[in-house]
Amino acid sequence: MTDTGTGAGPGTAAPGPASAALRAKLALAEPVLHRATARLWRPGAGLTARYTRYLGAMYHVIRASVPLMELAALRCAALAADPVAAPLARYLHHHIDEERGHDDWLLADAAAAGADPGGIAGDTPPAAVARLVGAQYYWIEYHHPVTLLGYIAVLEGNAPAPWLAGRLARETGLPDAAFGTVRRHADLDGGHRDDLDRLLDRLPLTVRQRTAVAVSALHTVDAVAELFRQLAAAGARPAPAAIH
């Protein structure tokens, strides 16, 4: 295993508030994600099927959350000389407890929506999910566990709108029980993002570490947007051919 984290590059902390810098970068990139999200939740024919596909894909994303954080915490333990490692590990251990079981919420929602939870859990995850999650495994293992903070910043900084669960319930006719995860994350994720901002501003991040967090975050925006575009397009009818 190659450690190219704190051993490579300047050892002084980067100037300026890290959380504000990351938010500024994401503000430039996130319109792409917002457009993909709007496309996914567009009203009309196919919304129920799109929502069910979303539950399945997000199950495969979210079930990786705790293992990713556990791996990152383990890597922190191997970086005892790195001043970022110990506070990062404390944050991860706390966050692991908060995130555990969220994949089960998605399976419960899928069952309420009439889908087969066992089938979802046994499905091969889409390649777009592997692209989203797999990059984090690589960066944690072969670069530095702090990169995971960019991933977390995007997932928790783009929580469902508080009104989304109600709108989807009305337009799909599915029971309220099918929207538990959307509703809970609308309530929880804003506070989690604030916690992450405080951590980013406390950590003595080097310039290269701040860059790594930003690269991870921007990749996550792109990968989630691509996943949502695929979910929105799956099963869509092709446009009718023009008549000449």
Predicted regions: what they are:
Residues 2-3, 9-244:
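Non-heme di-metal
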